[in-house]
């Protein structure tokens, strides 16, 4: 995550949308722990077909949510999308030009298509194995500004 933390766009950002990682995603839990008191970090909470945003004030305040993703369930709803400076987005696959394949429910595409996100810098975090040359694009798909490819550790038995 140091690659991300060294980016000027991250250093300038005050309000950051990020995700609490699942086991098969680039890990963000240490990042959340390190930055939750220095920057305003927002995490998505699944509510029906939409993602609500809530502030992550401390890792200990997170609970397993609907999809077994850690969520700040007891924090107030965040609605000031226009104040978000940076969005860090997970995915299953990415292309070098910013296309993203999610898990198929469209949660992030619906969230990021909100006009308030138009000026938000969007970064996808990927392992090298998640990079592909091309992905199908639907009209509702939101393209990312940058893909950061982070090293992974593979254990082989």
Language-model features, listed with the residues they occupy:
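N-terminal active-site beta-alpha-beta segment that forms phosphate/nucleotide-binding
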Residues: 1-82
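Conserved phosphate- and dinucleotide-binding cores of soluble alpha/beta proteins
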Residues: 52-157
């Amino acid at each position: 995550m140091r690659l991300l933390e060294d980016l000027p766009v991250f250093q300038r950002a005050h309000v950051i949308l990020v995700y609490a990682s699942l086991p098969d995603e680039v890990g963000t839990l240490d990042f959340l722990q390190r930055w939750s008191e220095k920057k305003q970090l927002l995490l998505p909470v699944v509510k029906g077909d939409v993602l609500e945003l809530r502030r992550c004030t401390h890792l200990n305040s997170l609970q397993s949510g609907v999809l077994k993703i850690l969520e700040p369930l007891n924090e107030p709803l965040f609605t000031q999308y226009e104040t978000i400076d940076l969005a860090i987005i997970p995915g299953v696959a990415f292309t070098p030009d910013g296309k993203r394949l999610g898990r198929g429910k469209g949660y992030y595409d619906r969230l990021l298509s909100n006009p308030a996100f138009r000026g938000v810098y969007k970064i996808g975090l990927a392992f090298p194995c998640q990079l592909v040359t091309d992905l199908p694009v639907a009209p509702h798909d939101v393209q990312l500004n940058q893909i950061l490819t982070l090293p992974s550790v593979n254990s082989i038995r």
